[in-house]
Design a protein with these regions (language model features):
Chain A
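Short cytoplasmic-facing helical segments at TM-TM junctions of multi-pass membrane proteins
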Residues: 117-142, 224-227
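Short, membrane-interfacial amphipathic segments enriched in basic
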Residues: 1-41, 216-217, 221
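Loop-to-transmembrane-helix entry motif
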Residues: 35-38, 48-56, 91-99, 148-153, ...
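Final/C-terminal transmembrane alpha-helix of multipass membrane proteins
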Residues: 227, 233-250
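Membrane-interfacial helix-loop-helix connectors in multipass membrane proteins
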Residues: 70-93, 160-203, 207, 211-230, ...
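Start (N-cap) of specific transmembrane helices in multi-pass transporter permeases
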Residues: 44, 135-156, 230
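Active-site cofactor/substrate anionic-group-binding motifs, chiefly glycine-
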Residues: 44, 48-100, 104
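Hydrophobic alpha-helical transmembrane segments of multi-pass membrane transport proteins
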Residues: 84-127, 155, 212
């Protein structure tokens, strides 16, 4: 009995994964014509990106400050405080910035996307578009997906920048690490490959989080409870997938 | 014939909604689809607009069998019809003007000056030219439905479908909507399908009417005729036309014996 229950669960999982994969292919196909409407796309980049700026910048500053404090404390035990710049940069660029940005994106922009599309479904707006011979996948889903994919690497870069400033603020201004050493160590030991790793991660997270948010909204049950459930699923699924993909990508880059 | 439904069968989760339905909508006329709640009136609209496929039978619109049309064909066909949703279904991130302009921008390359004039003309027709700058959230229910009507006619459709256009309107808005439906039909020659359970309002505008019951057409003909020949009709038709509580459609949902259930709770 439990064996059968397990099989059903597995089948359901595979079925859902398949549905999301098909949806991704449809989105990518519709993304090409969506690119010909830059106004819609720019609006969505603004929605997903610019409107997340404050939370990303604030979080970046605090994460950088904590990183500066912890790393300084750890490095001091081995007498190598001058490596603080390198530690902060590598930690931020390769791991913390892409992962935390993706988690914040899921909570801020992802939920907004899901609930907006879900409510459009619940209030017949998507059906109305279909009756007007306008494909909602092309007009609603694809620009929002692309907007998220473009916004994520930009937000990640901003997070890294502010995070480094935060680490410098604590390490150099408060703890007294030499400013020149802080920046020159960083410059000497952080390579393009490290930056690329973070950027590749942010693009992959951007695709995953935007896909989940748009998919959940587009297929939400058209009720208040249905939209609420879809929004919750967006946050949970995006967070878990982000952390899983982070491991896979980190292993791939080693 | 604009819409021709023949021998339509449709079931949801094994429960039959339509079992051999026949409905014909003639060009240039207002056809009313009536019936108590849950008889599948809205489902019929979904079938006519190709949102869902029929299980069996044929649905033809403008002489084309919907089952034989691909996605492109269905979209091409939809460009020839307009639909007014119960709640208006206006796009909430666009203002009134942009809502009405939406189908024009999507399907044509008209210059901005022409779109401006076209949209204002349609808004003037529904009496809301002055509300062009408002957002959908700022409109009353009746106004939202009129904007949706302007949007539905902006591409000059041959067929207009109204889904429960009278629900929840005050007497003034109701009068306005009734007048507009009649006007669209008479002045523009648009064939109209009006789905509603409001027998009295429909009787004032519809040329033909169908009363659905039990998945089939229970009665058909001009609304006045339907009301007049009550005596010869089935109990279901009589109950619907007179709004009686007693009849085949029971007031009480099936339940165990009332007294037995009350006393069982005490024990």
């Amino acid at each position: 009995m439990s064996q059968r229950g397990g099989n059903d669960l597995l089948l359901e999982g595979v079925r859902r994964l398949g549905a999301v994969a098909i949806f991704l292919v449809q989105l990518l196909l519709e993304s090409v014509p969506a690119l010909s409407r830059p106004r819609l796309l720019v609006h969505q980049i603004y929605n997903a990106g610019a409107r997340s700026l404050i939370i990303i910048m604030l979080s970046g500053l605090f994460v950088g400050m904590v990183l500066g404090l912890q790393a300084f404390n750890l490095l001091q035990r081995f007498g190598s405080e001058e490596a603080l710049g390198t530690a902060a940069a590598l930690g931020l660029l390769k791991e913390l910035s892409p992962v935390i940005t993706a988690l914040l994106f899921a909570g801020r922009a992802g939920t907004a996307l899901t609930s907006e599309i879900g409510l459009m479904r619940a209030t017949d707006q998507l059906t109305a578009m279909e009756i007007m011979a306008v494909d909602p996948l092309r007009h609603v889903a694809a620009p929002r997906f692309l907007g998220g994919v473009v916004a994520m690497p930009l937000l990640t870069a901003i997070f890294s920048l502010i995070g480094l400033y935060g680490a410098q603020l604590i390490g150099v201004q408060l703890m007294g690490v030499d400013k020149g050493v802080f920046w020159s160590q960083m410059q000497g030991s952080v390579g393009l490959r490290d930056v690329t790793e973070g950027m590749v991660k942010s693009v992959v997270f951007g695709i995953a989080c935007s896909l989940i948010a748009v998919h959940e909204g587009y297929h939400a049950e058209p009720t208040a409870a249905g939209v609420g459930l879809a929004t919750t699923r967006t946050v949970v699924a995006s967070s878990v997938i982000t952390l899983l993909l982070d491991y896979v990508l980190t292993a791939a880059f080693l | 014939m604009v819409v021709d439904v023949r021998g339509l069968h449709y079931a949801v989760g094994g429960r039959p909604i339509f079992a051999g339905l026949d409905v014909q909508v003639r060009r240039g006329r207002i056809t009313a689809i009536m019936g108590p709640s849950g008889t599948g009136k809205t489902t019929l609209l979904k079938l006519i607009t190709a949102q869902i496929p029929a299980d069996r039978g044929e649905v033809s619109v403008f002489g084309e069998d919907l089952a034989a049309l691909g996605r492109r064909g269905i979209y091409a066909l939809r460009k020839r019809l307009g639909m007014l949703f119960q709640n208006g279904a206006l796009l909430t991130d666009l203002d009134v003007f942009e809502n009405v302009a939406f189908p024009v921008r999507e399907h044509t390359d008209l210059p901005e000056a022409l779109i401006y004039k076209l949209v204002l003309t349609k808004l003037q027709a529904v009496g809301l030219r002055g509300a062009a700058g408002l957002m959908p959230g700022e409109l009353s229910g009746g106004m939202a439905r009129r904007v949706a009507l302007a949007r539905a006619i902006v591409m000059d459709p041959e067929l207009l479908i109204y889904d429960e256009p009278f629900v929840g309107l005050d007497p003034i808005s109701l009068g306005v909507i009734l007048r507009l439906i009649k006007h669209m039909n008479e002045a523009l020659g648009i064939t109209s399908i009006v789905v509603s359970h409001d027998v009295h309002q429909l009787a004032t505008i519809a040329h033909d009417s169908y009363l659905l019951s039990g998945g089939r057409v229970a009665a058909a003909g001009p609304p006045a005729q339907l009301r007049a020949r009550r005596a010869s009709d089935s109990a279901a038709v009589r109950q619907f036309m007179t709004g009686s509580e007693d009849g085949p459609v029971a007031f009480h949902y099936p339940a165990p014996d009332y007294a037995a259930q009350l006393f069982a709770a005490e024990e």
